[in-house]
Design a protein with these regions (language model features):
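Generic structural hydrophobic/aromatic packing signal, biased to beta-strands
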Residues: 52, 85, 228-230, 281, ...
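Charge-dense, extended regions
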Residues: 105-222
């Protein structure tokens, strides 16, 4: 993908190959393609895909076609972009929270420093102060990114193909969910596997975090979400299913029932608790740890009876304070999935 220079020196009668038609791509362009392959290609969330499709308005183009002119279009208003997402993917979470999260991915403010650098440190979109749009908010392609698309045909074709394939994958996910009569729980599908990076983005966070900071769970107060990640291996001092609907769960070390995450979880208990709290539970079988993905088993409806207790520390020589509570899911786990997880 890097260069057509490899074809030099093959002789003047050398017949052009696919590789010969590739223009060089820069390190930044290559990093952007890496980001697109990791985040956009799987099609887990339509928001970024629809926003880019609206702003890029690519035409079908192949390397062996006659080169076509491409230029960035005019800014598009926030409400128009939201309408496009809601129209094409009515089952999706069309909230402002999810839209803002998608924008933060596309302007690169979402990523940690290392990931931002890994993906080229190059925003794809930016806000534009445009009159005539709702609240004056509109979005356009970042000028440098648009210039890359306009001047490097190979980069443009590869990026457009990734975008189209991501959109096709996304449509397949939503079509399959509809066929199975599955309803999205926020942006998650029951029994589907997600990586920790997927979960942070699909929770609508505007800033990702590192796996080390997330640990077994992390509260994001801006979105009122607290995903919980369990690597399942039942033992005396490990998180353990008590039934298909309840799990014995240990907090991070040093936490008490008065720690921020428990104060948040216990605040506003009542019939409307689920409207202000979203606690999705993800479980990974130890045998599948190399894959790095967790099954979504549903969201927590209650933290029952949180109590301060102790468990052995990492050395096994001492103990640490933790809070033990019973997580009660909104609905029981399917028996087949339950057996798979606990076996």
């Amino acid at each position: 993908m890097r260069s057509r220079e490899k074809s030099l020196g093959k002789g003047k009668h050398h017949e052009a190959t696919f590789e010969d038609q590739l223009e060089p791509v820069t390190d930044v362009e290559d990093a952007i393609l890496k980001m697109a392959a990791e985040l956009l290609l799987p099609g887990l969330r339509p928001h970024e895909l629809v926003i880019l499709a609206q702003l890029c308005h690519f035409v079908s183009e192949r390397l062996d076609d006659v080169p076509q002119h491409w230029s960035a279009g005019s800014p598009i208003g926030r409400s128009e972009l939201l309408d496009a997402i809601r129209t094409e993917f009515p089952q999706s979470d069309g909230s402002d929270t999810q839209f803002d999260s998608a924008i933060s991915v596309l302007d690169y403010s979402y990523f940690t420093g290392p990931n931002c650098n890994r993906f080229g440190n190059q925003p794809l979109v930016e806000a534009a102060n445009s009159t005539g749009t709702e609240n004056g908010t509109a979005y356009r392609l970042n000028s440098r990114f648009a210039d890359m698309l306009a001047t490097n045909r190979t980069f443009r074709i590869f990026f457009a193909d990734t975008l189209r394939t991501g959109m096709a994958n996304c449509r397949d996910i939503f079509r399959e969910a509809a066929a199975r009569q599955q309803v999205f729980d926020h942006m998650f599908l029951y029994e589907r596997k997600y990586s920790m990076a997927d979960v942070m983005r699909l929770c609508g966070w505007k800033k990702e975090n590192t796996p080390q900071n997330v640990g077994g769970y992390l509260l994001d107060k801006e979105t009122n979400t607290m995903p919980i990640f369990v690597k399942y291996a039942a033992s005396q001092y490990e998180d353990e299913f008590l039934s298909t609907q309840e799990m014995k769960y240990f907090s991070k070390n040093g936490r008490t029932p008065q720690s921020p995450e428990f104060r948040w979880a216990l605040n506003g208990i009542g019939p409307n608790w689920g409207q202000t709290h979203f606690v999705p539970l993800f479980v990974m079988r130890k045998a599948e740890e190399a894959e790095g993905k967790y099954y979504y088993v549903g969201h927590v409806a209650a933290f029952d009876n949180p109590q301060l207790t102790t468990k052995p520390d990492a050395s096994g020589q001492g103990s640490v304070k933790v809070t033990l509570s019973i997580l009660r899911l909104a609905r029981p786990i399917d028996p087949e999935l339950y057996r798979h997880l606990v076996s």
